[in-house]
Amino acid sequence: MNQVLSKIGQVKANIDISGASTARSASLLCELVELQLMHNPKYQLPQALMPFRQKIFSHYGQDGMLAEIFRRIGEDTQRFVDIGTAPAQNNSNLLLLKGWRGLWADAGIAKDETLPSSIQILQREGKLKICRKLVTRESCRTLLSSRGFAEDLDLLSIDTGYNTHHVFTELLAFRPRVFCVAYNGMLPADLDWAAPYDAKAVWDGSTLFGATLGTISAAAEAGGYSLVGCELSGTDAFFVRHDLLKGRFLRPGDAMFHWEPLRMHLGQMQRHRSAMPLPA
């Protein structure tokens, strides 16, 4: 706790004396807000995931939180599916760097020849497959199974924007060990709500997208998974299969406790541009 308070003081001092650009000042303010948020006593409780958040390739701190989840439950097949991804910023680049194999599924991924060299090498080595199709409730199972990713998954990460919840409920049957699912942090956890399904719909920037954390958590519990934490940004929730919980996580399934409101501004801190290193 004292370390957090000390860091807050350092950032405040940097803001006061920086005389830096507007972008740099905004970055420092975001860092200050993040540090103050992390001062919340519930994040200091034993088994809390929040202290482990770390951004390497993920949009926010998902990299570190996923790493801690797998530290607790262990890695098995080291296979993942990342639905709704971007090559430079996602929840799976760090896993690829650790030697995992997986599938990216997103209609917006650029053509192979325009992807970074490191990604092209992974494709040639058979460590990464790419599906450039719109992932819908009707197509998701076939898209994964036809590419050999219907079973034996350690992680299934889903963020399709508008229809995330509907794709998630369809893929519960695939039984990955861990789900990372985007939720609607604009709405409270105790509201039972999901966006009406529309296969062609995309998020328009409004509150009409996805589903509330409570709705997703209830579907997860019914499907054999428990909520174990949310990213501080209020964007992603983490679910672990019931047989793997074994007292390793703080208040599993408690959506009201784990809920975080949407804080997209936390992604504005200045960092090095994400790029996958070339294999050694």
Predicted feature locations:
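SAM cofactor-binding core of SAM-dependent methyltransferases
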Residues: 50-151, 155-158, 162, 174, ...
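Short glycine-/acidic-enriched loop or helix-start segments at secondary-structure transitions
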Residues: 91-92, 114, 167-169, 190-191, ...
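A structural signal for short, well-ordered beta-strand segments and their strand-loop junctions
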Residues: 82, 104, 157, 178-182, ...
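Rossmann-like AdoMet/SAM-dependent catalytic core
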Residues: 24-74, 81, 140-144, 190-280
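Short helix-to-loop capping/linker segments positioned immediately adjacent to catalytic or ligand/cofactor-binding
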Residues: 153, 167-168, 224-228
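N-terminal auxiliary segments of SAM/dcSAM-dependent transferases
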Residues: 2-39
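A short alpha/beta connector and helix-capping loop motif
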Residues: 129, 166-202
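Short, well-ordered loop/turn elements at secondary-structure boundaries
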Residues: 97-99, 174-175, 221-223, 233
